[in-house]
């Protein structure tokens, strides 16, 4: 993984979060993970739940999720094999409602109401842009930074002008703001609002309890203690006032997968969408 000029512990944190995002961002991975919520399934049972996958597409996806340690294959007998979440895979699921909450507040309004799963996939696309995590981290810790200074921090071994394509992409995506050419860069409200998502991913990737996200040295808000409330994938929600907390030892949330794939979440009021907000 690429090395930045940030402190070693921060550099390692960014690398872990980038790796975690790479596990779930590939097309259909989140949908397969959600389809596996509940008791382990035979291959044919899982295939019926993700019937939009063409023949031959599911097996390599399952293998990659098994290799990533999110799904386990259990061979009961030669003719009885099941697939289910590993403990690590199940522990990752609570980050998904945090992503939906962020998307509902900050992503631009789509022409049609979007189901939660599409909110998740759109958001993951933004977060996995090249150098996105490192740039967001650097901007969070330094507030306003010039492009040249960001290049020294994020890609010290590369020509400093190489920082501008990913920076321009983050500006286009609405996660970073600047007043124009030669002016410093800073996180937008949407970029800063990623704190709960990135903090929780950091805690998960470090093997910590998810409630440690509130104490993350960069993205944490130790004083923020929102009341716990269940999150249902099919629930219509207005623009949220707060984010659900990271889970600790409680059972994983119940995911109504059919509803998650087919029902839309409520559109945000137009006033909740910042001008130049993140684009889908």
Regions of interest found by a model, annotated:
Residues 1-15, 43, 49, 62, ...:
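Recognition helices and adjacent regulatory flanks at domain boundaries
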Residues 2, 96-138, 192-280:
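Amphipathic alpha-helical dimerization/coiled-coil segments
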Residues 14-57, 119-159:
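N-terminal helix-turn-helix DNA-binding core of bacterial DNA-binding proteins
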Residues 52-67, 156-172:
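Short amphipathic alpha-helical interaction segments
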Residues 66-76, 171-181:
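A short, conserved structural fragment
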Residues 77-99, 183-198:
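Basic, amphipathic "hinge/linker" alpha-helix immediately C-terminal to the N-terminal HTH DNA-binding motif
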Residues 123, 132-139, 147, 163-166, ...:
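Structured N-terminal alpha/beta-domain signature
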Residues 150-152, 165-168, 217, 231-235:
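Clustered cysteine/histidine zinc-coordinating segments, centered on FYVE zinc fingers that bind PI3P
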């Amino acid at each position: 993984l690429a090395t930045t000029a940030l402190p070693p512990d921060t550099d390692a944190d960014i690398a872990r979060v980038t790796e975690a995002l790479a596990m779930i961002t590939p097309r259909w991975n989140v949908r397969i993970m959600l389809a596996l919520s509940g008791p382990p399934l035979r291959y044919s049972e899982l295939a019926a739940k993700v019937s939009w996958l063409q023949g031959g597409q599911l097996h390599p996806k399952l293998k990659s999720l098994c290799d990533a340690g999110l799904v386990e294959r259990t061979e009961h007998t030669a003719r009885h094999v099941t697939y289910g979440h590993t403990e690590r895979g199940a522990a990752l699921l609570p980050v998904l409602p945090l992503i939906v909450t962020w998307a509902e507040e900050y992503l631009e309004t789509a022409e049609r109401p979007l189901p939660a799963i599409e909110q998740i996939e759109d958001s993951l696309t933004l977060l996995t842009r090249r150098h996105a995590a490192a740039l967001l981290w650097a901007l969070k810790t330094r507030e306003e930074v010039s492009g040249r200074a960001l290049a020294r921090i994020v890609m010290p071994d590369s020509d400093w002008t190489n920082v501008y394509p990913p920076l321009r992409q983050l500006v286009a995506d609405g996660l970073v703001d600047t007043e124009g050419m030669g002016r410093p860069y800073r996180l937008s409200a949407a970029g800063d609002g990623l704190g709960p998502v990135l903090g929780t991913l950091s805690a998960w990737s470090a093997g910590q309890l998810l409630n440690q996200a509130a104490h993350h040295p960069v993205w944490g808000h130790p004083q923020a203690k929102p009341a716990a409330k269940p999150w249902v994938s099919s629930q219509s929600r207005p623009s949220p006032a707060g984010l659900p907390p990271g889970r600790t030892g409680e059972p994983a949330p119940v995911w109504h997968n059919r509803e998650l794939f087919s029902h839309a979440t409520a559109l945000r009021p137009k006033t909740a969408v910042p001008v130049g907000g993140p684009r889908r």
